[in-house]
Amino acid sequence: MNSMSILNPVYRRDNLAPFYVLDDIFSSEELDRITAYCQQAGTEKAQVVQSRGMIVTDDKLRLSDIMMHRANRENKWIFDRVLEAFEMANRDAYNFELDGFNQFQYSVYNHQGAHYEYHMDVSFASVSDRFLIGRKLSLSIMLNDESEFTGGEFQMIIDSQTIEKPITVPHKRGRFVFFPAFMVHRVAPVKSGTRKSLVFWALGPKFR
């Protein structure tokens, strides 16, 4: 593994760790390689899960393009590296009971106004898909440099005090941002340029 650095390893507020940050897991060359791999596969319009479990397109809630990637021989090195980081984050900050993960999402916010409104990654809708209801620890990885876009901030609401002024995690290429899947978060509207990221979800038994 490349040398690791930690920025604010655990952001704590009222004994809660809403996010955990790691830097330098992937080199710049590796990030280029990941981006090229994802771009080659293409993208499709992102959708959302409604309260009744229906999966629909809703530009007011989510306007971006995505593609899901399952683990295979070609991308195994990505999963191996991310697994090590998940283990560190979970050990240091959360101690969740996790079963692992087998896919990731490539996300592209490629025009003005592209966004993903406030949401949780774990679904409480009436669905049987364990990939939606079993999410416990989320990870967002910034693929491109912050100079390539404006807006698109990754923001979180953790209590009543942060509703009006959400916590904004600073952009940095390659930054890993871990957070519990029940944390309310969003990608603010992109003002210019293109924002690219990977998203992983580690699954496990339901929160008790």
Where does each model-flagged region fall?
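Fe(II)/2-oxoglutarate oxygenase catalytic core
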Residues: 1-176, 182-208
